Amino acid sequence: VTAEEVIDLVHKKGMKKAAQEVDVVTTGTFGPMCSSGAYLNLGHSRPRIKFGGGSVYLNDVPAYAGFAAVDVFIGATALPDNDPRNKIYPGEFNYGGGHVIEELVAGKDIRFVATTYGTDCYPRKRLETLINIKDLNEVVLFNIRNAYQNYNVAVNLSDKTIYTYMGVLKPNLGNANYSTAGQLSPLLNDPYYKTIGIGTKIFLGGGVGYVAWQGTQHNPNVIRGDNGVPRRGAGALAVIGDLKQMKPEWLRGVSFLGYGCNLMVGIGVPIPILSEEILRYTAVKD
């Protein structure tokens, strides 16, 4: 059952009976997760070229090339060199790394440009071509901090509008922005990480992924409620998966006015019901 359905089930049948009947509770979240990106292996051209030490662009968005000859990594928040940023305030940030990843997974051709220095074994100094996900050796989504367990509500106490990664905040408490899947959220349904850990198989971006490690800034030692739910930012997941299996419906490049670009990521995590205690955690409500 889903993390929403289990709430009614527990209410109708009680914790003990529900724990006997339910094998797995499915959880999910879909939101902007800026510590996301993808690494690509393009294979070797003729003559060969070494990207490492040079510069690489995908649809004019810079990627990191400090690996071996033909490995690159593109981050969700990367911006083209010619983007005006906030010189025109608030900046629109119409296209960035998250949009490139969405277009890659959608099967669109991506303009790839690399410039570097030549060597005896890699004599080529420039490569400009179109790449497509179906032709690449590996394309892997690797997100170092996703599915944050809890987070702040953002408000603005000043007398002017401000533009943030939590959206546009109106002056004088004119609005309050937050981002959570509530009772569906994976780490709110397993607040002490009893079933979610390294190697957990998950739904990632419309395909299959895995929990690779704890996410950056993972901090389980926070104040919690009686139900285990943290009262501030706590746990996070680092996740990995084959981008070739994923779908653009679950990986969306987005723009935050006055702030920058991002990638919305869909994540689903199954929680095996091994005990009444674990079921009790999954009955958490909004």
Each language-model region and where it sits:
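Anaerobic metallocofactor- and corrinoid-dependent redox/one-carbon enzyme cores
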Residues: 2-286
